[in-house]
């Protein structure tokens, strides 16, 4: 197998596996936030702000996987 082909396959795996965790985390986070808002509607603003911060941190992991995939494609 040529090194470029191996790098492309590794980049695909990096994005695929690196996106599973953030997707599950964001799904759980939004579900729990909606559950909290349903229980206590007056706290919806605080819950929403905390949810967006959590989503940003979870999405950062997917962006790191994207950077690794780009490094594998263009540097390797």
Regions found by a protein language model. Give the residues of each.
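Hydrophobic, small-residue-rich transmembrane alpha-helices and their short perimembrane loops
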Residues: 1-76
